Each structure stands twice: as C-alpha cells, then as structure tokens.
Amino acid sequence: MPNTNKKMRVALSAWEIGRVNSGLGAKIGGLGVVVEELPRELVKAAAKQHIDLEIETLSPCFAYHDKNKLTKLDLLVPVTLAGHTFEFEIYEHVFPDGHKVVYFWDHGQLHWTTPSAIYPTAPQVGLKLYSAVSQAMAGYIKQGDFETIHLHDYHVGLIPFYLGDDYLQKVPVHLTIHNATYQGIVALIGGGYKSLERINLPGEQLFHKYFDFFDNLNLMKACMLKVHETGGKITTVSGDLAGTWGYAAELKQSQQEVLAQATAQKGAPPGEVFLPNRCLDLFEKLPIAGITNGMSDRNRPENLPELKAEVLKTMSIFMNPVTQFEMLARDHNFDVHNLPIKTELKRLLHLEAFGTEPLLDPILITAVGRLVEQKNLGLVADIIERTLVYDAGTKFLILASAPEGDGSGKASEERFARLAATYPQRVYVNNSFNLPLSKLIMAGGDFSLIPSRFEPCGLVDYEASLLGNIVIGRATGGLTKVAHCAYLYEWLDISDRVGEANAFFAQMKTAIDTYRHHPVRHQELMRTAMAIDAGWDASATQYVNMYRYGLLMKQWHAERHELIQKFIKALKEDQQMFAEFFMPARQEYGDYLDWELQKTLQQRNLI
C-alpha cells in the first residue's frame, strides 16, 4: 500500500547536541543530553500520528570535530559582522541511527573551542559568535524546505531575526528554554542601534521593541518576543502546558511573589532570593508552557549498560578487587522485582568506597555532580557531621569536583576532603570523573542529595529515582516532579545558609527515620520511585503537537490578515473617517485583532 503519511521537515538548532562519544558532538550540561535523545523520540511520536518527520539538527562545528568524518556541502553562507562579510563552511553527517546533523564552521569564530569550552566567557565575544552562527544557520534554513524551526536556548535565538519577517509569515518558529539564568545579556557599545548594526541587524527598527533590557541587549528576551509575535510557542523543560508547576511555574513568578514566599518560609524577610527569571518580567506576561523532558530507557536499572559485565570490561573501573571481580563476573541489572541485586550493589559500593564488608545495615547517602553554584552541593558538607551523630550507621559517598577557576567550588572540594580524612570509614570523597563508579553509586546508594539552587529540568532526580536511590533535595523546578517519592525541603533565602542547612537536615532526619523505623514505607517509596514513567513518549508527543499547532497558527494568522484586508476594502470611501476614530483599548481591555487592524491602517498612512 502507498504511504499516506504526511511529511514534515523540522530544523532543530542548538549549541549542544550530545553525541560526545562520536567525537562530533558537544555536551556541557542537560541541553546536550536532551538534544541527542529528542530527534529519534520525535520521529517515533510523529509516526504514531501518521507523520513522517524529518529532522535536521543544526550545530556549530567546533574545532575538535574531525572534519574528515563529515561531508562538506557545496554551499557557502555569507555572514556579516561589523561591516565585514565572510563565509561559513557547511558540513553534514548522518549518524548510525539515521539522524542527520548539519555543522557550521568558520575558523576565525570557532578555532578556540575544545570539548570543555564551547561558550565564550566574554559577553561581547559571545554576541559576535552567536550572531555569526545564527546568520549561517538562517542562511541554510532559507535554502531548505523546512516547515518548522525549533530553537533551543538563547545562543541560537537570533535566527528568527536573520530569517526575516517574510519567511516567518509562512514558517513557525518555536523556542525551548533550558536555562533562563543565562539570557545573553550584553552591554551596549555605542548605544543600542550601533550594537545591533555591528551584528548585521537594523538597530533603529529592532532595539527598543525587542532587545532593550536596562540598557543592555537581551537575546533571550528578543527571541521570546519574536517567537510569540509570529505565533510560535515558548516552552521550558519541566511543568505542564498550562505552566502550573515545575520550571514553567517558577519562571512566571515575580520578585514580589518570591520574596513573599521566602518570608513565609522563614518567618522573617529574606536577605536575598534567587529569581529564576532574572527579573525579565516578560516571563510573567507571555504564556510559557512546560514540556517535561524524558530520559532514554537505557537509564532504567534493567537496561543500564554500566551494570553489564561486558560493557564494564571495556572501561576504566573499580579500585577494590572484590568489587572489580564481581562487577565483571556477571550482569547486575535489576528491576523492582529483583531488589536483592540492588542489595548486592550496595555491598559492592561499600567495598569500593570503604574497603570493608558492610556491617549491620548502613545507610549510604550519595551525592554525584559538579561543585558549582547551581548544584549547591557545598551545602552537603554543612550537614554531614550532624547526620553522622544523628545515626551511627549513616555513611556519605561524594563523587564531585569543581571546575578550574571556581574558587567556591574548590573550597567545597577541600572541605569534603577534610571530612573524608576525619571520618575515613564514614565519608568517601572522589573528585575524579568515573562513569562506572557514578552509576554504581546511584544504583547502590539509599539516598541521593540534590539541594540545587535551581534545576530547570532535573534529569538527575529521574536517574537516581529509577535506580531506587531516593532523592533528598530542594523543591525547585523540575525536581518537584518526584515530590511524591522524595524528601524535598523548601527554602528561598540564599543569604541564610544556616537556615537552609537546617531545612535540608530536617528532611534528612525524616528520611533516615523512615528507613530505620518504617521499612515497609521506605520500600514502598523506593518501588514508587523505580516505577516512574520517565520515558519520552508523552513529552515527544507534546512537541509533535506543538509543531502541528504552529502550522495551524500560521493558518490562523493568514486568515486573520485576509479578514482585515477584506474589511478595509469594504470601507471604501469611509476608510479615512474610520481610521480617525479607531483606537484599540490597551492592556487587558485590548483586542489583538483591533491592534492588527490599526497596524494595517498605519501602513496605509491612514493614521
């Protein structure tokens, strides 16, 4: 039978695409994880709706990418910065899973990049780079036959402006915000108009309407406005479509709302609060939808590669000979019906960390991550000693390190090291990256500590929960999706570290008490966590529906335009008189169609 499925082509633009093992990708954080997994999940979800979805992921070509593995296209795209025009080279590669990635390369812009450094630290350098790559991507997109553009974060947020209004009238553009803390805020040089003109945009036309943010450029603000104006959808990575919970709800909170909430928590005015939207009140005014990211089923304990002996044999792994032997001797995958294997993993983890067989029933409390401000893992050091006193069977296993140049993170790293030296049989600290060990810690641990300052998506809570490692953390952003099977504390005053540590420790005590005195309840909680549906099916379906919605919005915009033109034509000789009296109401009393009508009348010089 002939294929009657509808075809749809999507260009998905992002600065990180994952696929680091291929040497042709980039992953600094969760963005790379999501962009790697999302395309194939979208294709599957679209097929269920009888849509043949073709996705091309657009990525910068970083200097460490092996261009010999890429296919160079017979296409050069001109880019202009500060009046100087040069050309980007374009490459493509089809990965074994069938997914196509298009790469954009210019030596002058990208020669400095490394696997751990793909974002410029200087805002002005970043502005030029993001502008250049966005111009190149827009030039490529306009030469294709894409029906939808899906942007990920502000780094590619200039693309709609380089596509131009004529293109945007026909093709919907959507924006997914993975982290609103970083908005592309850049100081002006020579004023707003000149700052935009240097990146090949008409400053007088665009600056005040889209980019102006307290006398800075704000790339995220500009992209949000343009996407909304042209009928696209703005989404973020946790919450529901109505934005009633998760990161979508947090971004809508005003400073006054956050301050009031913080005051209620501590019974006194806070010293300082962290604002998820960074005072960009556009988040409070535009509809922000949440589409909660999923995870590949490979992260479930029954599938996790790092619990398979054959996989571990190819990796640098464990220090303890018993742990090494046992992990290589057989697979240790498990599920909710095979929890004795998790108990064995707990034993092997204890051997690896402390070199001895566990006595009685220790509680293994784990933390895996980066010692950076966002993750707030330094707070764990504040509660270790009081936890050791509270329950003599508690032990901590910390796998975390600070980036070079992060003074606060390095101080936390040193503090953890001192605690490990003071309590060698109760505190284990490792500051080197070890993937198999990180998975063993997750799989063998009882509790996972996640006191994040903010967590837009929160994949780490899924990762821990699926392995029966119950989360103890802060109720923020995407972490709230596991609230039904976790111990979450609420705290917003980031200046009151003692108060936050007390709130954190209160949840720690509750978790320990449940483990010790209510084992049935703990087992129920663990089984609930392991049964979480963390897959991509629901999320991918919502993204596909968003693409369909965008096409329908274009249809509505076209019909609305036709309606206005028809009405103006019907006015005949009364056009001038009507225009003199016509003035749409503002704010909540205004009608969007009225404003569109006024805009058209102005274009005809009737107002």
Language model features by range: what are they?
Residues 2-579, 583, 587-595, 605:
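Catalytic cores of nucleotide-sugar-dependent glycosyltransferases that transfer UDP/GDP/TDP-activated
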